[in-house]
């Protein structure tokens, strides 16, 4: 990774095409939560807070992950985070709370979720349902109303941060290449570069393993060469 160092201040300056320290923290927290490595997660949480993630940003990331690695992993992550905060407080470390989440609307949830998804993909959703949405319509409703409305409209994390969370979890989990490809396309649509995604994969290789990283690289390559 190319990093410029301010010699006088001793600080690292990340170039525009690099993941910044907060984004790298998001990647690590997501990957460790998804795989259930709570010891690794504990360290990643400390590093994420030190990198500038607020308490509420981390809470939102861990909640967001419930949609991708299940409530048990999400809840374990939340409990681990609570322990980390208690430990830091006992050490006299005060972490910023950060912005509070927005109130989620109870009405029009499906349409709001549909619009969020269209914004993420950059494509209008029209015509007859296909695939899983046609086979089990209720799961399409759940995705729109819960994931893309209840979670995405809470704010605190922007769309880029939420999608980086998602892609990192899917790479770490493995075996979900179809979904990973879709979310890599979304990441590219919301402003991430291929280089930044490659950096996320390299970080996951260090934290989680080469097998998961190699699969992530292949999926990224397939998306880039397909052009859609």
Sequence positions of predicted segments:
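Acidic, glycine/proline-rich low-complexity segments that act as flexible tails and inter-domain linkers
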Residues: 1-22, 34-50, 71-159, 172, ...
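Short, structured motif recognition centered on aromatic/hydrophobic residues
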Residues: 24-32, 58-62, 161-171, 180, ...
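Short conserved catalytic/interaction loops centered on acidic-Pro-aromatic/His motifs
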Residues: 44, 177-185, 198
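Winged helix-turn-helix DNA-binding recognition segment
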Residues: 53-57
